[in-house]
Amino acid sequence: MAATVRCFGRVLIHHQRCSLATVTSQTSLYPCCIYVPVPNRHFAAAAKPAKKTKKGTKEKASNEKKDDIEKIKSYPFMEGEPEDDVYLKRLYPRQIYEVEKAVNLLKKFQVLDFTNPKQGVYLDLTLDMTLGKKKKVEPFASVLSLPYPFISEMSKVAVFTGNASEIKIAEENGAAFAGGTNLIQKILDDEIQADFYIAVPEIMPELNPLRKKLKTRFPKFNRNSVGRDIPKMLELFKTGLEIKVDEERENFLETKIATLDMPSDQIAANLQAVINEVCRQRPLNLGPFVVRAFLRSSTSEGLLLKIEPLLPKEGETKESDKKAV
């Protein structure tokens, strides 16, 4: 019995020495004037509760905004037209104007806003480019002669012809450049730059190197830029108005049709001429080509036009084509 007690005492003394050695090694790692023993922790610290976010309040605010918007949208339209010049647009359906009234309103806006009376009048058209069977109308460009021209500056026109007498006729009628294949390299090198390019039919096969360079300005029959009547073509392209579909928005066309100081009937006539030219680019039996039309000035908002009376009828176009022939 005494032997077992003696053995137990030795084990206890040895354990105390080992524990003292570990304590001294820990104190050497953290030198300080005051010794504070750090016990070994065998449990995880309790995590602090996360702060409550204001997600609920944000959702409530967004829901309230949605409710307000839905309430505004749910307001019924007022009957008739607004009696005053100042009114809430959401309470009335969008006004659709006849051309004459729209022009008069633009003139009235100019007086009230003290803007330039000679500012431009613009026509914005949204087009239906579908042809059926997954085909579309290609973006087009055209030049037309307006019934009441307003452009003061003449456009530069280059004439392609290999005939010396035709070159002389072109120069006498105001061509900026006239010549044959000798003009091709000069155009590729940007030595010659013109607003429009016209040609006689015989020289067309030799102009293929210019297709990529000129793009939509390359002479074509359907754009009236290829023909034999050089003086007539020069007159059209020097004084005519170019209209073309926007390159990015392929169903949108914007063009200047007049100045605001012109008489209302002249502005209306130019507008009708532009719409007739646009509608030539697509068969009428496929339905209306012009979907929406807005008339505006340089400083005013766009006024939605009543488009149905402006669209040409199929019988009218056939008669006009016969007269032209």
From Swiss-Prot:
GO cellular component, as recorded: large ribosomal subunit; mitochondrial inner membrane
GO molecular function: RNA binding; structural constituent of ribosome
Superkingdom assignment: Eukaryota
A biological process from GO: translation
Transmembrane portions of the chain: none
Comp. bias (Basic and acidic residues): 56-66
Gene3D superfamilies to which the protein is assigned, alphabetical: 3.30.190.20, 3.40.50.790
Keyword annotations of the record: Mitochondrion, Ribonucleoprotein, Ribosomal protein, Transit peptide
Positions of the UniProt region annotated as Disordered: 47-66
UniProt transit peptide range: 1-50
Cellular localization per UniProt: Mitochondrion
NCBIfam families linked: rplA_mito
Similarity comment: family membership: Belongs to the universal ribosomal protein uL1 family.
Protein name: Large ribosomal subunit protein uL1m
